[in-house]
Regions:
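A short acidic, Gly/Pro-enriched loop at the edge of an enzyme's catalytic core
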Residues: 96-105
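Class I SAM-dependent methyltransferase SAM/SAH-binding core
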Residues: 41-43, 49-96
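Short catalytic micro-motifs in class I SAM-dependent methyltransferases
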Residues: 110
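Conserved alpha-helix/loop element of class I SAM-dependent methyltransferases that forms part
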Residues: 21-40
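A short, conserved alpha-helix within the catalytic core of class I
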Residues: 115-124
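Conserved catalytic/acceptor-binding region of the Class I
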Residues: 125-201
Length: 260
């Protein structure tokens, strides 16, 4: 199912580019401060439409980006027209032939969890020089923002999507655990270091519905249930929240240095 779901993002690349948020600028400052300043060579896995890639390129990194979806890769190419130091490859990281020259950084923003868990850490190590950094960004929806809305929206998810865990509630950032298990289990990386960033994004009704249609869980719903869910959420925002809600995010940068 994961292999199938990771392909749904390519179905509507323009919506993805329009609706998905970017990343806190401090992520890229902390990456540089960790020993990987520009013009380091970066391999970005799953760049999508280039949300993080643009920020890296603007800082002077030399980037090879690999993207599974052809439509997403084409959108990224358009977004990065002014950055000749970026090369975009269409394909899967698992099957791509690594170049002979290793990279200084392997970077993945909200994409590493889509890579085969059996090989993603070891293959990232293969792509890096000794001392190079594996930098992954995870994005979490956390407690905060328009909390009353999200509690009500949860009931709509439970009604229309049977995959929804019952009584699911948003957690504060402090309750989200660091995910270092796969790094700790590898003998090729040192201990993981974590940096966290909380931030808010405001959405109108149409903007939020657009965002929901970029999520794999929403896109994979049967069409009648998907339409009913989106209609219900749209009415909820319009009628109870004046057509605008705020969502709180936690972005987490995980850094691990290759040691062998």
């Amino acid at each position: 199912m994961t292999t199938e779901l990771r392909r749904v993002f390519d179905e509507d690349a323009e919506r993805y580019d329009r609706a998905r948020p970017g990343y806190p600028p401090q992520i890229f400052e902390d990456l540089a401060a960790a020993g990987a300043p520009p013009p380091a060579r970066v391999l970005e896995i799953g760049l999508g439409t280039g949300k993080a890639t643009v920020s890296l390129a603007e800082r002077g990194y030399r980037i090879t980006g690999i993207e599974l979806g052809a439509s997403l890769a084409a959108a990224a190419q358009r977004n990065l027209t002014d950055h000749p130091a970026v090369t975009i490859v269409t394909g899967s990281f698992e099957e791509w032939t690594l170049p002979e020259e290793p990279f200084d950084v392997v970077f993945a923003a909200t994409s590493f969890h889509w890579i085969d868990p059996a090989t993603r850490v070891s293959r990232s190590a293969d792509a890096l020089r000794i001392g190079g950094l594996l930098a992954t960004v995870a994005t979490h929806h956390i407690k905060g923002g328009t909390e009353v809305f999200f509690a009500a929206a949860q009931r709509l998810y439970e009604r229309y999507d049977p995959r929804t865990p019952p009584n699911l509630r948003l957690e504060p950032a402090r309750d989200i655990p660091h995910d270092d298990a796969e790094i700790a289990a590898s003998d090729r990386f040192g201990p993981a270091d974590f940096h966290r960033y909380e931030w808010d994004a405001a959405y109108t009704t149409s903007e939020y519905l657009d965002l929901l249609l970029t999520y794999s869980t929403t896109r994979s719903m049967p069409r009648p249930e998907q339409s009913a869910l989106l209609d219900g959420i749209g009415r909820l925002i319009d009628e109870e929240h004046g057509g605008r809600i705020v969502k709180r995010y936690l972005s987490e940068l995980r850094l691990a240095r290759r040691i062998r």
